[in-house]
């Protein structure tokens, strides 16, 4: 349809506004059937196609829902996370979550989930003109209500963006001790780490801890003997000289520089891995599909640790043998079993 035939040009079109502009329900219905409008929910439409991104669609659904609320409420939980720009994993976004203070009732519909809970004034902020729980309250709500892995993903992202801090989270956690979900929240907060740089890294860490394969550190810098930075890895098991890398398409996209394509980044990553191996570190990699099979990821990392440990043992043996060959006298000075160096045989 032409510009003259279109309803008012806004990303979100409300039925009441269209009717006020002279449009009828029949006309709106025809536009929906023709695919020129998409119905978000009853009485709310968007022009042309819906965004492919789930978070972008949910932002539109939030706006469409909030304008129809008859009583004050703050957008909360995963809906608040979307407004704050926190990435989510495996969290349903088919309904808008809001929180009202006590004496309200728990409204639930196909597109709305209303929580009734105490809500301090300083726990509410505004995003794009919409009342929303602040990042800390949002994080606590998610930590109380989501499964552990999904909660850690959101908390990691907030900590990495410095929208959250462990000290503030732990302080606010004291306010909800004994409340439903408070133990789950405490566990998720204890597991969260802002050094994770992606959903995949967060999920990997949770899985590795669950399978008793925790890395000794994150974002480990491998340096040459002269102290030159060779590369930084997502995970490290320093005792075995093993680093771990989660490979995701989003990660490679984030590394792109102007004029580069993904192939250039993959080649640069291969060169970086070769340089890390040249410093006598082993490398283990995994991809998104393996996060859906935690047993396979755990088996891959366990085998890599065993190989790296065996390599370390052989290297130490070779180094010891080389040292003895260069200094045969040291072999004669090596204490025999049951004999203390510089003293009489040990008593039995």
Q: Which ranges hold each PLM region?
A:
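Short gly/ser-rich loop at a beta-strand->alpha-helix junction or flexible surface loop bordering the NTP-binding
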Residues: 1-181, 200, 217, 306-348
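Surface segments flanking catalytic/ligand-binding clefts of nucleic-acid enzymes
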Residues: 6-9, 22, 159-348
